[in-house]
């Protein structure tokens, strides 16, 4: 079997409809477009979401929410990562050394029951501790 010898399975392909080629074809005269109207004209194409004059779904539904311009901090539960408790000073770099985080992370928030105890060790303005204010 070679690539040039491949053929589609029998019955899987159909002849294309030749529009406007006589009454006997079943698609002659108006070429399956009916009589008159906007859709029968040449160059007609319907807008995405057009529902025939009915209010489109995307306009019927309410707008939802917004996108904040401020970056969300990467949240770490101190109870789950005990290695953070043993650090002498807490910065984004030192947390990255004990816990695998993406390089794109710039702000970190530490949460958990014992997170308040770590507030004195935080030496980076990009690291915050829950309930430490």
UniProtKB/Swiss-Prot annotation:
Stretches the record annotates as Disordered: 1-58
GO biological process assignments: translation
Transmembrane segments: none
Keywords annotated in UniProt: Ribonucleoprotein, Ribosomal protein, RNA-binding, rRNA-binding
Biased composition (Gly residues): 21-35
UniProt entry tagged with the keyword Transferase: no
GO MF annotations in UniProt: rRNA binding; structural constituent of ribosome
GO CC annotations on file: cytosolic large ribosomal subunit
Its job: Binds to the 23S rRNA.
Family: Belongs to the universal ribosomal protein uL15 family.
Matching NCBIfam families: rplO_bact
UniProt cross-references to PANTHER family, sorted A to Z: 50S RIBOSOMAL PROTEIN L15 (PTHR12934), LARGE RIBOSOMAL SUBUNIT PROTEIN UL15M (PTHR12934:SF11)
Assembly, per entry: Part of the 50S ribosomal subunit.
Name the record gives this protein: Large ribosomal subunit protein uL15
Organism: Campylobacter curvus (strain 525.92)
Lineage: Bacteria, Pseudomonadati, Campylobacterota, Epsilonproteobacteria, Campylobacterales
Originating gene: rplO
